[in-house]
Structure formats: structure tokens, C-alpha cells
């Protein structure tokens, strides 16, 4: 039982390290998103789309890391050898890691929502630019018609 407990402690330490690594990676993605919202005002639509794609790749990488940590915690949770005493010990050892992992799921969802909003901003900006171009094109066409004395038909 003691050997099994020591093994569980080692797996719990590894799980904590992997949770911390995933937490740092997710924090960097969140910081990247904070920078994006500031860049949205001054960036062109094509730059915004490129930034969104770059951020999407970072989010997917962080999500894969979180999923890997979840699998690591699941394997560590299963290392109790069928003993109820060890099972309770495993649950206690991994409780904080599981709680942090659940918070990470909501953080990933929040970052994905922020990215979705950023993309919507890019689409609105594109629509506004197209509206300005349409108005300018209509003005040019009417000026040309007036200069050449053409009718609307």
C-alpha cells in the first residue's frame, strides 16, 4: 500500500507540473488576446484576419495541451489498484489539479468567444469599408455620366 501511495504521489506531482504548464500556455494565449483587442482599431481587415488565424492556432494548441493534461490526470486517477483507501488518497491528491483543469476549460471557452468577437469586428470593418467604396464608385459613375452627358439607361 505504501509503495502504491508513493507511486500516486509521483503521478500527482507530474500532474501538477503538467497543469502548471498548461496554465502558463493558456495565460500566454489570454495575453495575446488582450493585445489583439488593442490592435483591432488600427489594423486593416486583412491584418485582422491574419491575427485571428494566428490566434486560432494558439488556441487550438492550448486546447490540445489541456486535453493532454486531462488524459494525464485521468490516468493518474486510475492508479489506485482497486483499493478504496488508495482511491480516496488519489482523489485528495488530484483535487486541486482537477479544479484548475475545470477552470481552464472555461478560460479556453472565454478566449474562443473573444476570438469570435474579434472576427465579427473584422467583418463589420470590412462591411464598412465596402460601403465607403460603393458610395465612392457611385459618385464617380455619376460624375462620369454628367461629364459625358450620358443618360441613366
Regions found by a protein language model. Give the residues of each.
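Extended alpha-helical scaffold segments
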Residues: 1-153
Amino acid at each position: 500500500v505504501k509503495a502504491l501511495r508513493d507511486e500516486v504521489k509521483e503521478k500527482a506531482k507530474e500532474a501538477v507540473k503538467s497543469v502548471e504548464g498548461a496554465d502558463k500556455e493558456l495565460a500566454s494565449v489570454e495575453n495575446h488576446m488582450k493585445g489583439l483587442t488593442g490592435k483591432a482599431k488600427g489594423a486593416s481587415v486583412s491584418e485582422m484576419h491574419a491575427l485571428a488565424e494566428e490566434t486560432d492556432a494558439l488556441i487550438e494548441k492550448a486546447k490540445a495541451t489541456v486535453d493532454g493534461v486531462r488524459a494525464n490526470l485521468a490516468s493518474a486517477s486510475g492508479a489506485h489498484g482497486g483499493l478504496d483507501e488508495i482511491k480516496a488518497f488519489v482523489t485528495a491528491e488530484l483535487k486541486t489539479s482537477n479544479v484548475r483543469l475545470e477552470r481552464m476549460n472555461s478560460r479556453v471557452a472565454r478566449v474562443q468567444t473573444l476570438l469570435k468577437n474579434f472576427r465579427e469586428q473584422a467583418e463589420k470593418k470590412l462591411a464598412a469599408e465596402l460601403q465607403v467604396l460603393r458610395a465612392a464608385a457611385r459618385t464617380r459613375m455619376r460624375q462620369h455620366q454628367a461629364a459625358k452627358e450620358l443618360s441613366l439607361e
